[in-house]
């Protein structure tokens, strides 16, 4: 059997961590077994559809390296039907009417006001699991004919079988059972002719010959309704699996309101995260590889994927770990790849790099290759090189705690002033000579030089920073601070 798995987003929002994890796990599952990964669009909720959401889904999936074998842009065999639900309304309506004719569904003429009144009556009796009253199930054929003649609006409700239990062997959770007594007759076709989610999704999965449905745990409650529909058509079920929640550091479901994490994939792109790092990290949310290795390429993840290794517990989205994994991938880039990538994230409105040579800029950026967690972070380090640093009182306190710092600075300044050949090796030698002449070392040597020469307590290799600042800037910094 060829495995066919799908990711089926609604265009009501943009690609985020949660639905990326769903897409990614389906992709890994399909590719591990040399199967097909399908993306279809579930756009029946027309009022909530967002402009640009479909494009966001595909652009960001492709950026992450998740390429569908079939989609609205890459249509498969015609036997699989359409890849967008709004193009299948006739198909859904035909099958809903078929169930009515087979006495497995019925027309419901109840108005929204009648349904609301029914709901209020049940809640007033403290009924927790409210259900449809089945009022229209018992209409006579004459009543139905009269309603149709009067052109009274109706939806189509599925008739839930009585006294039946459905059990699935969930890929993630094991056996899960559902009892029909907990479910009321539900709408499968709304009065506007649009199929409901549970009806459309079953037809789509059947038409596309989906073998495994892997999705978020919020869909568990939909599963019994979908199984009933499969049974009504005498269709075989796919294999179901429900991934556990992704939570934030407070234990709440990860959302755009989670303060500790970026939620949308587009945000990671804009901050300069690498797509392969995000792919790697999200693959570890609710799934664990064998062994201790956590830095895994897409091909490695496909090779070692095992659906038996899904977690039954919620997974916490750890922004610190996300940054760490991205920093590992940043370090693995070739220097030319790293430079091209990071340059595109420099804030050129704040830092005028046009006045600098390419060699100078490359030298500067490579100093931070082992430090950056994401590319946009480079802007946190550039004040140092564009004379935008200011010292505070804490820095003055640091100086006052050092041994004879004024002598150290004076010796260093005189030697820098006399230096003719401006190279890193010569600057390193001057620092050594200053140590000997001032009879200091360690913090008493480096801190005064760093603060006066660079106007900062912190930074990468001192000799490299001094070299990049240039002789004139270094002497100006020292003179301004001495005053």
Swiss-Prot record:
EC code: 6.1.1.17
- Enzyme class, one word? ligase
The record's listing under SUPFAM superfamilies reads: An anticodon-binding domain of class I aminoacyl-tRNA synthetases, Nucleotidylyl transferase
This enzyme catalyses:
tRNA(Glu) + L-glutamate + ATP = L-glutamyl-tRNA(Glu) + AMP + diphosphate
- Indicate where this protein is primarily found: cytoplasm
A GO molecular function annotation here is: tRNA binding
Spell out the PROSITE patterns in the cross-references.
Answer: AA_TRNA_LIGASE_I (PS00178)
Here the disulfide bonds are: none
Top-level division of the source organism's lineage: Bacteria
Write out the residue ranges of the motif 'HIGH' region.
9-19
Which cellular compartments is it found in? Cytoplasm
Q: Where is this motif: 'KMSKS' region?
A: 253-257
Residues binding ATP, per UniProt: 256
Q: What's an example GO BP annotation here?
A: glutamyl-tRNA aminoacylation
Keywords per UniProt: Aminoacyl-tRNA synthetase, ATP-binding, Cytoplasm, Ligase, Nucleotide-binding, Protein biosynthesis
Matching InterPro entries: aa-tRNA-synth_I_cd-bd, aa-tRNA-synth_I_codon-bd_sub2, aa-tRNA-synth_I_CS, aa_tRNA-synth_I_cd-bd_sf, Glu-tRNA-ligase_bac/mito, Glu/Gln-tRNA-synth, Glu/Gln-tRNA-synth_Ib_cat-dom, GluQ/Sye
GO cellular component assignments: cytosol
Q: How does it assemble?
A: Monomer.
NCBIfam families according to UniProt: gltX_bact
The UniProt similarity line reads: Belongs to the class-I aminoacyl-tRNA synthetase family. Glutamate--tRNA ligase type 1 subfamily.
What does the record give as the function of this protein? Catalyzes the attachment of glutamate to tRNA(Glu) in a two-step reaction: glutamate is first activated by ATP to form Glu-AMP and then transferred to the acceptor end of tRNA(Glu).
Q: This protein is called what?
A: Glutamate--tRNA ligase
Organism whose genome encodes this protein: Mycoplasma mycoides subsp. mycoides SC (strain CCUG 32753 / NCTC 10114 / PG1)
